[in-house]
Amino acid sequence: MYFKKKYIGLIDKNCEKKILDDCTTIKICYILIGILIGTNMITLIYNFIFWDHYMTCNKKDKMFYCPKDWVGYNNVCYYFNNDSKNYTTATNSCKQLNSTLANNDTNLLNLTKVYHHDKLYWVNYSLNDNFSLSLRNSTYEKRSKYLPLLFICSK
């Protein structure tokens, strides 16, 4: 029933329209679908065989991962704690997270300009028995170790 229809299709060498029937049109569609499926299969097989090339990183790549709720910056992970604690308790809390109080360095200064710049944090630096440094607005201030402040852990 459908195989008796004729369609204007391709143009031959003499620039005349060729008339195609249903069988020829269906054959052309099957050939095109076969080519598409074949190229996709070849691509999948190639990617499967050479997957190692896609997974390796160059040694120049600086890729690192931080735990959930930690902030990654310059190959260091920082944790901004929301609980105020004194210097000793803050140090112990960081140890429980397998980290230390953040060191007072340029990376931390740059990071605090972006995150929580108006808060006061303990950093890893003792002045003497009862004092340590705290960080606020990218500047360091001398504080009593017994004063409860927020703190930043790093690892």
From Swiss-Prot:
Keywords annotated in UniProt: Disulfide bond, Early protein, Glycoprotein, Host endoplasmic reticulum, Host membrane, Host-virus interaction, Late protein, Lectin, Membrane, Modulation of host cell apoptosis by virus, Signal-anchor, Transmembrane, Transmembrane helix
Extracellular domain ranges by topology: 52-155
Pfam families: UL45 (PF05473)
Topology of this chain in the membrane: Single-pass type II membrane protein
UniProt GO BP: symbiont-mediated perturbation of host apoptosis
InterPro entries, A to Z: C-type_lectin-like/link_sf, CTDL_fold
MF GO annotations: carbohydrate binding
Gene Ontology cellular-component annotations: host cell endoplasmic reticulum membrane; membrane
Glycosylation sites: 82, 86, 98, 104, 110, 124, 130, 137
Location in or out of the cell: Host endoplasmic reticulum membrane
Induction: Expressed in the early phase of the viral replicative cycle. Expressed in the late phase of the viral replicative cycle.
Annotated TM spans: 31-51
Major location category of this protein: host cell
Disulphides: 66-77, 94-153
Cytoplasmic side: 1-30
Chain segments carrying region Lectin-like: 66-154
Function, in words: Down-regulates MHC-I expression by impairing the appropriate configuration or presentation into the plasma membrane of the latter. Participates in viral hemadsorption, which may help viral spread. Reduces the transactivating activity of host TP53, thus inhibiting apoptosis. Non-essential for virus growth in swine macrophage cell cultures.
Family indicated by similarity: Belongs to the asfivirus lectin-like protein family.
Subunit structure: Homodimer.
Name under which the protein is recorded: Lectin-like protein EP153R
